[in-house]
């Protein structure tokens, strides 16, 4: 009996420790496209249609930015910019009330950019101890760390971000264990770097020959008893894999002749990436993740060149992939084979990427219409809701709340409201 009591007591201690750990009570949305960059939330009860009365709160955000919201526990982080990029802004908000808890400015320089980009397009990332933001110009790419009270902790410059077409920067930082990773892949000497999360000091640097500026954000695959892999994409390397512990290149598949804008996606034992640009068409390849060195074309699982998204990142959920193209054509495919399951034009133009919440797929048009589809082998439109403002930002979901960023406001939609 004493042994049983002792075991139960030990279990209680473990549960208490786990429940008191940061973010243990709910899944945090701590980077671009949430946990693992997969764009998937298991939160339940969020509506598929709603009205203005259903928002928990709505907060005006000064300036303009296309970054998405980073969420850790009850705190939100988002960026913006004023005065043609000369002032870059960081905001932290209370997720329950929408109240701005603190803000900070970073003096910067203006530069040319695509008319549909912003000077604050990189989504913040967090590890629960600090939040990390990224701003770039032609002369520098600045990563700055804050504590959750808004205190500046460190700042690092990982080099210029040149772009002969003047599109500006679109990649976001990510955090892997105690390393902040930034992919600075542009029209100049490029690299992917790992910074010490506590100090900002350089841990490793992997030089890349990019050829055309890439805006993709890397993703990390971790498996038991396997070397972790950081997947990235660009024109020079195609799809590549780096060891995030030291920056060593594990393999690369040089398959692309156009630029990578959306991000790599892990689908089962495959990693896939897309490249495209202008009137040059698009390219996509899916590759088994276990490779080494230079990957030959016969190692590629499948490829595709039609109905591909350029800016929106694909979504992998269950056994299916969802390509939500910029022109509003959505294609559902079998992940393993690339075989079409269904295809439907839902209308609108898209800069945001689709996310999946409790099996339902959400995306937002550039005019601010939220479109919700059912996941699965049969096309089903679940709802359409007008935000009434332009949108280029991907939704974020955490703790039963969805955060929708427009050009002017941040909206909070709560589960169970409708």
List where the protein language model places each region.
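Positively charged n-region of N-terminal signal peptides that target proteins for export
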Residues: 1-4
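Bacterial N-terminal signal peptides
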Residues: 8-20
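Noncatalytic, solvent-exposed loop/strand surfaces
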Residues: 22-418
